[in-house]
């Protein structure tokens, strides 16, 4: 997370978030094969990336890519690491899951009937957000004239809880 705070502190206008992906024929690939090095997996990387995105985006810095972009046969060169073709979407999905968790933590109901306008944000890639929330006891439905969450307010609350007074100074 330190690099996120540094990007904000130094006045970056835009950033790219690239977790370590090991490619064939690299020095890291050799170390990986020998068991000397292992990159974080997808879940561990998502746990870091959503927080980085929250910090950077919340400071008004544009995040213009998340994850390495590989095309066609280049994907076959991935040896290890958190490569996913929709990594940016997964990070934003995780952030929306955190919004639901924050809503619940702050006294929201176990059953949330969100306005249909939230459906795209709170469904997620392969229904990740609503399925994970449901597994945690937070049931999400969508309907006309449903609850309209102030997402930015929840993101600010998460930022403050995550970083305390540090974030307020960036």
Task: Please report, for each region that a protein language model flagged, where it lies by residue.
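Short, glycine/charged-enriched secondary-structure capping and boundary segments
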Residues: 1, 29-32
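Catalytic cores of alpha/beta
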Residues: 1-9
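Short loop/turn motifs at secondary-structure junctions
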Residues: 8-11, 108
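Non-cysteine beta-strand/loop elements that form the S-adenosyl-L-methionine
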Residues: 12-25
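Auxiliary Fe-S-binding modules of radical SAM enzymes
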Residues: 27, 34-170
């Amino acid at each position: 997370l330190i690099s996120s705070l540094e990007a904000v502190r130094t006045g970056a206008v835009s950033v790219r978030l690239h977790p370590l992906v090991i490619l064939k024929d690299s020095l890291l690939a050799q170390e990986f094969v020998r068991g000397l090095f292992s990159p974080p997996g997808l879940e561990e990387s998502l746990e870091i990336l959503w927080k980085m995105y929250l910090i950077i985006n919340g400071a008004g810095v544009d995040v213009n890519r998340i994850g390495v972009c590989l095309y066609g046969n280049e994907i076959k060169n991935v040896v290890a690491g958190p490569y996913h073709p929709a990594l940016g979407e997964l990070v934003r999905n995780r952030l929306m899951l955190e919004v639901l968790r924050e809503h619940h933590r702050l006294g929201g109901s176990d059953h949330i009937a969100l306005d249909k306008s939230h459906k795209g944000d709170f469904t997620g890639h392969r229904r990740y957000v609503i399925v994970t929330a449901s597994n945690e006891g937070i049931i999400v439905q969508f309907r006309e004239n449903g609850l309209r969450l102030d997402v930015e307010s929840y993101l600010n609350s998460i930022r403050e809880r995550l970083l305390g007074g540090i974030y307020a100074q960036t």
